[in-house]
Amino acid sequence: MQTTIIYITGVYDTLDLFTQELKNAFESMGYASFTYDARLGEVSKQALIECIEDGTKRGQRFFCVTFNNLGYNLSLPAGMTGTGMLLRQDIFQGIGESKGANSVKKEINLWETYEIPYINILMDHPFHYEKPLQNAPATSVVLCTDRNHVRYIRRYFKNIRYTD
């Protein structure tokens, strides 16, 4: 069974350099790679979804390895399930819900939908990432460069099940 590691680039040059080195190392160990380029927005997102959909049909496994929460909030397009199927919009609207302009629908997180482990390497203190860590995918694994950062996450972010 082939394993593909998904990388996220296009936000910070320094992190892109780290990512490229990780990619080179993992490819030398036989892992396949997919790079999501944030500069390409929806084009890159669609290519990622197609890669996951096609790979899943062949029994392929996926992991995302990224830095500083990049891509934690990637979501599926409105009305799309994790099987490539589009749902009718009214399925998302329950009886009695407002359908007005202020109505907010929860976006469907890509990592959770496809059950892809989201390995997040924090280069900075977690204090700087309160919102992303509070809203981290359920599949998150947070790796820290400092043991004090690990203790901080374990104390303040109970939603993150795995950190080291």
Can you name each region flagged by the protein language model?
Residues 1-113, 117:
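N-terminal pre-catalytic "stem/leader" segment of glycosyltransferase-like enzymes
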Residues 115-164:
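Catalytic core of nucleotide-activated saccharide and alditol-phosphate transferases
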